[in-house]
Amino acid sequence: MKLKSLLLRYYPPGIMLEYEKHGELKTKSIDLLDLGPSTDVSALVEEIQKAEPLLTASRTEQVKLLIQRLQEKLGQNSNHTFYLFKVLKAHILPLTNVALNKSGSCFITGSYDRTCKLWDTASGEELNTLEGHRNVVYAIAFNNPYGDKIATGSFDKTCKLWSVETGKCYHTFRGHTAEIVCLSFNPQSTLVATGSMDTTAKLWDIQNGEEVYTLRGHSAEIISLSFNTSGDRIITGSFDHTVVVWDADTGRKVNILIGHCAEISSASFNWDCSLILTGSMDKTCKLWDATNGKCVATLTGHDDEILDSCFDYTGKLIATASADGTARIFSAATRKCIAKLEGHEGEISKISFNPQGNHLLTGSSDKTARIWDAQTGQCLQVLEGHTDEIFSCAFNYKGNIVITGSKDNTCRIWR
């Protein structure tokens, strides 16, 4: 084995190793999820080198420098104030979703007008209109981190795959018998998964456009799905109150997570794939062991339905958003609530951490989005100006751009 190069991954912090084995180029990652501003870098490098034979003594200084660069990134954007940069009247009919590519250089909007539009974030210019669906375009995604393809899922029961560069449709995936309401690319960008009101999810091959597997087992609509970091597992959350873990390589059921007593609203893995977080209309979130499917904790405290939930990039913090108008931050280790985010005057339907993990973004029916301190729960900023409910909001990878989508048919870029 011969080490060819070292690459940085900023969020979550890590070093990627490119090496040659039997003439083949391979990559592996060293996750540095516990890296903090006060970490002793020399001691950490020593520890890493003990565990990783590819990092010989001749690489010590290089690895030190890389980790110092990661350390510097950790505190960036902590005092960033967002200003309204552009208001885009994106579509004639209502918007359904917004999504950013990894760098934040462009984003997409889905709409009831049956199209998906691609936008340049810096100028607010429309780059392309993806036309071809025969009904509402509801679920949309980039194949991040690559960002050269877009998937759109529609009420016309099909999913389409598009080129970002040309706007050309590569494939139309047909097979669902009801509306497609969620979709996701696997991390390797070889598969796209679609979830439907027909109670099934399907995996599709991006290269040849063929269906790979149908995931059957739910008895009601699938409204949430996501892959784990390594791409070998996929979870589907359903209105049947359960979440199913599937083997993405075989299409087989691995575990059924039973315990919620109402519809599932969100389901996601933490970064190291050890835990699954589920949110439900039963006012609770649950944490599950991703290997055996056992429930390890129930996160309580909200007075109404949980509408969204997420881990931060390192998996140390959990955020929950509720119809009770509050959000909460929990420690994944202790499962205790460490902050309650109060200030919205309507239900919170979207919540996400910035990649640095120090800020949270919430979108609400009170027509505002808010930025919060993820440690203290203090509201740092209110993003005002929309004239109707905000249903979608997102940070870019650097954490210095926010996009908000509203029922007022506009998208706002904040930077």
Swiss-Prot record:
GO CC term (a single one): ciliary basal body
Annotated TM spans: none
Localisation: Cytoplasm, Cytoskeleton, Flagellum basal body; Cytoplasm, Cytoskeleton, Flagellum axoneme
Pfam families, alphabetized: WD40
Gene Ontology biological process: cerebrospinal fluid circulation; determination of left/right symmetry; heart development; intraciliary transport; outer dynein arm assembly; protein polyubiquitination
Outcome of swapping residue 364 to T: In CILD52; likely pathogenic; loss-of-function variant unable to rescue ciliary motility defects and cardiac looping abnormalities when expressed in daw-deficient zebrafish; decreased protein stability
Key words of the record: Cell projection, Ciliopathy, Cilium, Cytoplasm, Cytoskeleton, Disease variant, Flagellum, Primary ciliary dyskinesia, Repeat, WD repeat
SMART domains: WD40
WD repeat start and end residues: 90-129, 132-174, 175-214, 217-256, 259-298, 301-340, 343-384, 386-415
CDD domains: WD40 (cd00200)
GO MF entries: ubiquitin-like ligase-substrate adaptor activity
The keyword Repeat is annotated on this UniProt entry: yes
Ribonucleoprotein in keyword set: no
Family the entry assigns: Belongs to the WD repeat WDR69 family.
Assembly and oligomerization: Interacts with IFT46.
Function: Required for axonemal dynein assembly and ciliary motility in ciliated organs, including Kupffer's vesicle, during embryogenesis. Facilitates the onset of robust cilia motility during development.
Protein name: Dynein assembly factor with WD repeat domains 1
